[in-house]
Swiss-Prot record:
GO BP terms, alphabetized: L-tryptophan biosynthetic process
Listed pathway(s): Amino-acid biosynthesis; L-tryptophan biosynthesis; L-tryptophan from chorismate: step 2/5
A GO molecular function held by the record: magnesium ion binding
PANTHER family in UniProt: ANTHRANILATE PHOSPHORIBOSYLTRANSFERASE
Organism: Lachnoclostridium phytofermentans (strain ATCC 700394 / DSM 18823 / ISDg)
NCBIfam families, A to Z: trpD
Domain of life: Bacteria
Gene (name only): trpD
UniProt binding sites for anthranilate 1: G79, N110
Protein known as: Anthranilate phosphoribosyltransferase
Lineage: Bacteria, Bacillati, Bacillota, Clostridia, Lachnospirales
Residues holding Mg(2+) 1: S91, E225
EC number assigned by the record: 2.4.2.18
Length: 336
């Protein structure tokens, strides 16, 4: 099927949902050669991925991952990467605040790809055991409303793609698929993207993948996060409908900063930044976490405004609930 699909793509023809899903199945099963995988990814990128092609590919990738079993609504806070901004780990830090606010967070991540420090890197530097089996992570999720799923543990089939992606050295559909293939089947999601043109299409993809409440965001300073230094373009998913709007820090009483104020560093440096924020240290980095946490809380709850959600996020940090959440997570991940 992958050869036929390449022929279609070279002729600028869109693939059907069924064909795109079958191709992903071939790739994830190890049935496609590196040459064919590279040709397919390049041809798809040159044509431009459709909503159906992305959705089908994500569904195909999910079929081949190890699942984390649970019985609750869970939130994923994630970015596609590729913004080349080298910010500190905003999404990961935000996860501790949001989960401490009572919203279960199932974070899915990897080591660094497009930055100096990925989610797995900073958590490891904080002392978290990232190598837990799915059953152990499920227990922690049940116990404290938070877990981390290391991509290499859950997506072993990616070994068939990794060498090709490294050699190609260009963005491919897999830059988008990682955040869409949460092993816990997250039905709540804040997804940051690396270009504005992806906001609406990926909101439609999340809707097709069964996300109940979600938000796709792009900071106009280039960040794949809700930005504290510029406007953020948003598309919100609620009750099967999409809503477009713009977010600005001033809406919740925060002051814009320079993009450089959010830059991080090595895993050890970013771990220190995360711990300082959760301990109550003030400044732009804390405000960026409050902004992103407020958006998550507001997105999930029906009974509050964005401003009230920001107050909740601030109180969670100032009351030390967020730092206690981090310390408890470290403790539970290392228990034997």
């Amino acid at each position: 099927m992958i050869k036929e699909a390449i022929y279609q793509l070279v002729n600028k023809e869109d693939l059907s949902y069924e064909v795109a899903e079958q191709v992903m199945d071939e790739i994830m099963s190890g049935e496609a050669s590196n040459v064919l995988i590279g040709s397919y990814l390049t041809a798809l990128r040159m044509k431009g991925e459709t909503i159906d092609e992305i959705t089908a590919s994500a569904a195909g990738m999910r079929k081949h991952c190890v699942r984390l079993l649970h019985n609750m609504d869970v939130l994923e806070i994630v970015g596609t990467g590729g913004d080349e901004a080298n910010t500190f780990n905003i999404s990961t830090t935000t996860g501790f605040v949001v989960s401490a606010a009572g919203i279960p967070v199932a974070k899915h991540g990897n080591r660094c790809v497009s930055s100096k420090c990925g989610a797995a890197d900073v958590l490891e530097a904080l002392g978290v055991n990232i190598m837990l089996a799915p059953l152990e992570s499920a227990k922690i999720l049940e116990e404290m409303g938070l877990c981390f799923m290391f991509a290499q543990t859950y997506h072993s089939a990616m070994k068939f793609v990794a060498p090709v992606r490294r050699e190609l050295g260009i963005r491919t559909i897999f830059n988008i698929l990682g955040p869409l293939a949460n092993p816990a089947g997250a039905n709540l999601e804040l997804l940051g993207v690396y270009e504005e043109a992806l906001v609406k299409p990926l909101a439609r993809v999340l809707l097709k993948l069964g996300v109940k409440r979600g938000m796709v965001v792009y900071g106009r300073d280039g960040l794949d996060e809700i930005s504290l230094s510029h406007q953020t373009v948003c598309c919100k998913i609620r009750d099967g409908k999409l809503y477009d709007y713009i977010l600005e820090p001033e809406q919740i009483g925060l002051t814009k900063c320079k993009k450089e104020d959010l830059v991080g560093g090595s895993p050890a440096e970013n771990a220190a930044i995360t711990r300082a924020i959760l301990n109550g240290e003030k400044g732009p980095k804390r405000d960026a976490v409050i902004f992103n946490a407020a958006a998550c809380i507001y997105m999930v709850r029906d009974d509050i405004t964005l401003q009230e959600a920001a107050k909740i996020a601030t109180d969670i940090i100032d009351s030390k609930k967020a730092i206690h959440q981090l310390d408890k997570f470290i403790e539970l991940s290392n228990r034997r």
